[in-house]
Amino acid sequence: MATHERRVVFFDLDGTLHQQDMFGSFLRYLLRRQPLNALLVLPLLPIIAIALLIKGRAARWPMSLLLWGCTFGHSEARLQTLQADFVRWFRDNVTAFPLVQERLTTYLLSSDADIWLITGSPQPLVEAVYFDTPWLPRVNLIASQIQRGYGGWVLTMRCLGHEKVAQLERKIGTPLRLYSGYSDSNQDNPLLYFCQHRWRVTPRGELQQLE
């Protein structure tokens, strides 16, 4: 009796299933709600910018420093309240990409596909924004991790670039062999390299197949 290998499919989130950058929107929201933290963030920006230039856009600690600056000095209860407020705002303002979400649904309806949603946005935000969708409980989620530290929130893992490859390898082993991958960003090229079928999502939510 023939055995059929399961198809492993990767989806990015920001710019792929929806238009906006969830984590970037969250940081801007925090500063709008807590303008005094901008006094801390402003002198950190040159350090963050130089570090991203040297380390690359996928580096963890520069963005962790930015998150810390946006959240420093506030209790966990206050930050959780702000996060809940942001989630409500984001759900009201997010622009979904129906064509990409239709592809996701098609894979979920098949019996031979394992779906991995791998995103640079923090896991608590992703789970809170999409808690009531039929697809979130049925995908395997890998996302950036945040925790309390040094009087604010910090990133303990930033799931971007080559880190996406490393995280997926920890879950399913090596060598990676993916059937298909969907992303808007060149940052995901390291993971798309392992995909048999590669799809680029345009800023308008259209799909272009890559060679």
Curated annotation (Swiss-Prot):
* Cellular component annotations (GO), alphabetically ordered: plasma membrane
Q: Which Pfam families match?
A: HAD
Outline which residue ranges sit on the Cytoplasmic face.
1-33
Pathway stated in the Swiss-Prot or TrEMBL entry: Phospholipid metabolism; phosphatidylglycerol biosynthesis; phosphatidylglycerol from CDP-diacylglycerol: step 2/2
Q: Where does this polypeptide localize?
A: Cell inner membrane
Name recorded for this polypeptide: Phosphatidylglycerophosphatase C
Q: Which InterPro entries match?
A: HAD-like_sf, HAD-SF_hydro_IF_YfhB, HAD_sf
Which molecular function GO terms apply here? metal ion binding; phosphatidylglycerophosphatase activity
UniProt function note: Lipid phosphatase which dephosphorylates phosphatidylglycerophosphate (PGP) to phosphatidylglycerol (PG).
Q: Which domain of life is it from?
A: Bacteria
Needed co-factor(s): Mg(2+)
> Its catalytic activity?
a 1,2-diacyl-sn-glycero-3-phospho-(1'-sn-glycero-3'-phosphate) + H2O = a 1,2-diacyl-sn-glycero-3-phospho-(1'-sn-glycerol) + phosphate
Query: What taxonomic ancestry is recorded?
Result: Bacteria, Pseudomonadati, Pseudomonadota, Gammaproteobacteria, Enterobacterales
State its Enzyme Commission number(s). Answer: 3.1.3.27
The membrane topology of this protein is: Single-pass membrane protein
Query: Into which EC class is this enzyme placed?
Result: hydrolase
- Recite the UniProt keywords alphabetically: Cell inner membrane, Cell membrane, Hydrolase, Lipid degradation, Lipid metabolism, Magnesium, Membrane, Metal-binding, Phospholipid degradation, Phospholipid metabolism, Transmembrane, Transmembrane helix
- In a knockout, what does one observe? No visible phenotype. Simultaneous deletion of pgpC and pgpA increases phosphatidylglycerophosphate (PGP) levels almost hundredfold relative to wild-type. In constrast, simultaneous deletion of pgpC and pgpB leads to a twofold increase of PGP levels. Lethal when combined with deletion of both pgpA and pgpB.
- Look up and give the organism this protein is from: Escherichia coli (strain K12)
Gene3D superfamilies found in the cross-reference section: HAD superfamily/HAD-like (3.40.50.1000), SG protein - dephosphorylation function (1.20.1440.100)
Q: Which NCBIfam families match?
A: YfhB_g-proteo
Instruction: Kindly list the cysteine pairs connected by disulfide bridges.
Output: none
Chain ranges on the Periplasmic side, renumbered to this chain = 55-211
Q: Which GO terms describe its biological process?
A: glycerophospholipid biosynthetic process; phosphatidylglycerol biosynthetic process; phospholipid catabolic process
Q: Where are the transmembrane segments?
A: 34-54
